[in-house]
Curated annotation (Swiss-Prot):
GO cellular component assignments: cytoplasm; cytosol; membrane; nucleus
Main location: cytoplasm
Family statement: Belongs to the SVF1 family.
Transmembrane segments: none
Record has Amino-acid biosynthesis as a keyword: no
UniProt record, GO biological process: ER to Golgi ceramide transport; response to oxidative stress; sphingolipid biosynthetic process
Compartments where found: Cytoplasm; Nucleus
The species this protein was found in: Schizosaccharomyces pombe (strain 972 / ATCC 24843)
Protein name: Survival factor 2
Classification via InterPro entries: Ceramide-binding_SVF1 (IPR051385), Svf1-like_C (IPR033394), Svf1-like_N (IPR013931)
Domain of life (superkingdom): Eukaryota
C-alpha cells in the first residue's frame, strides 16, 4: 500500500517573540496550545504542552500534556506519557498575556529576555531561551479565505533544567523547538483526520528540520504541509512546496488506524535571500516508542467532552536516527544526521476507508 501527497503555498511571515501572546478572547470554538519538543544532550527526549479549549456550550478547559523518553542506552526504562485536564477557571493569565499558571504548573515567558520558565509539577523544571527568529502561517500558507488555523514556530531554543522520572531527578541540557497553534471557528478535528509532526535534530544541535503535515477529512480539500530549515543556528528557509509519500501499511493489534512503514519527503522553497533550497529524506520506520490512547489518560468527567471534540484520538511516536540531504542553488551543502522525532496523531478514519 502506498500513498502520495503534494502541497503548494507561499504565504508566511517572520515573527519575533513579541508575537507569542495567548489569545483567549474569541467567543466561538477555539483551541490554542503552546508546545516544546526537546532533544537532550544525554540522548533522551521530551515534550510538554499547555493548551486552552473553548468547546462551546460554556465549556472551557485547560489540558496539559508531557512526555519523557529515556535515552536508548537506558535499558528497561519505560517512557513517561501523561496529561492532566482542568476547567478553565484554573488557568491564570498574566496581564501581558505571555504567561499562564494552571494550579502548580506554569509556563512563564519574558519577551524582553526571550526566556521561558516552565514547570510541570513533579516532572519538569526547565529554563528555555529562544535564540533565533520564528515564523507564522495561516492555513499553512494557502489561500483559504476561511482562515481556520494559525501556527507559530521557533526552531532554535536552548534548554536546561531537571526532570524527575521514575523517582529520580536528573539535570538536563539540550535544544528545543517551540510550536504554537490556534484553531478557530470550528472543531480542529473537523479539519483533518491525521496530523504528522516531525523534527530532525542534527547531532550538532545547531541544524534542525521541522515538518508538519495535515491530512484533510474531506478528500476534496488540499493536503497541507509546512517545513523549516535551520542551519548553523539560523533559520534560513520556510518550505511550503512539499512532496510526501509513504509505503506499507502497518496496524497495531486492537487499533483501527493504519500506520506507514516507510516515508519519503522532498521539501522545497527558497532561502530568505532568494536561492532555491531542497531537502530530501527517506526512512524506514522502526519500532514504535509509544502508543497513546488519548481518551484513556483523560479524567472520567472529560472523556465524553473529548470524544465529541476530538473523535477517537491516538498518538503514535517514533524516535530513531535518520539523515536528510540539503541542497541550495542545486548544490549539496549539508547532511543532517541525528535524532528524528515523528509523531502521528490520528483522530478519524479517512473518508475513503
Amino acid at each position: 500500500m502506498s500513498s502520495s501527497y503534494s502541497s503548494r503555498a507561499e504565504k508566511y511571515d517572520l515573527i519575533s517573540c513579541k508575537d507569542l501572546t495567548w489569545d483567549l478572547s474569541r467567543s466561538h470554538l477555539t483551541t490554542q496550545y503552546k508546545s516544546f519538543y526537546m532533544c537532550f544532550d544525554d540522548g533522551s527526549f521530551g515534550y510538554l504542552q499547555i493548551a486552552y479549549g473553548n468547546l462551546g456550550l460554556l465549556v472551557k478547559v485547560t489540558p496539559l500534556g508531557w512526555t519523557y523518553y529515556p535515552a536508548k542506552t537506558e535499558k528497561n526504562v519505560e517512557p513517561i506519557v501523561n496529561s492532566s485536564t482542568y476547567l478553565y477557571r484554573s488557568m491564570k493569565i498574566s496581564k501581558d498575556r505571555y504567561s499562564v499558571d494552571v494550579q502548580k504548573h506554569f509556563m512563564h515567558f519574558n519577551s524582553s529576555t526571550r526566556e521561558w520558565h516552565i514547570v510541570i509539577e513533579g516532572v519538569y523544571d526547565l529554563k528555555i531561551k529562544t535564540e533565533d527568529s520564528g515564523f507564522s502561517l495561516v492555513d499553512f500558507g494557502q489561500n483559504d479565505s476561511s482562515s481556520r488555523m494559525e501556527h507559530k514556530i521557533f526552531p532554535i531554543n536552548t534548554v536546561e533544567g531537571t526532570v524527575t522520572a521514575h523517582g529520580r531527578e536528573k539535570k538536563l541540557t539540550g535544544v528545543a523547538v517551540y510550536v504554537g497553534a490556534l484553531f478557530f471557528r470550528e472543531k480542529f478535528t473537523n479539519l483533518g483526520h491525521t496530523w504528522q509532526n516531525s523534527i530532525l535534530f542534527d547531532k550538532s544541535k545547531k541544524s534542525i528540520l521541522t515538518c508538519l503535515h495535515y491530512f484533510p477529512r474531506d478528500p476534496s480539500q488540499p493536503f497541507r504541509s509546512q517545513a523549516s530549515l535551520t542551519l548553523d543556528g539560523k533559520l534560513i528557509a520556510v518550505l511550503l512546496d512539499n512532496e510526501y509519500s509513504t509505503k506499507g501499511a502497518a496496524q497495531v493489534d486492537g487499533i483501527r488506524y493504519l500506520l506507514p512503514e516507510q516515508i519519503h519527503r522532498i521539501l522545497s522553497g527558497q532561502t530568505f535571500d532568494g536561492k532555491p533550497v531542497r531537502v530530501e529524506l527517506s526512512a524506514e520506520l522502526e519500532e514504535l516508542d509509544s502508543i497513546t490512547d488519548v481518551l484513556k489518560i483523560f479524567p472520567k468527567w472529560a472523556k465524553d467532552i473529548v470524544s465529541i471534540w476530538a473523535g477517537l484520538p491516538f498518538v503514535f511516536v517514533w524516535l530513531q536516527h535518520i539523515t536528510a540531504e540539503v541542497f541550495i542553488d542545486n548544490e549539496h551543502v549539508a547532511t543532517l544526521s541525528g535524532c528524528y522525532y515523528l509523531e502521528q496523531t490520528c483522530v478519524h478514519l479517512p473518508q475513503t476507508c
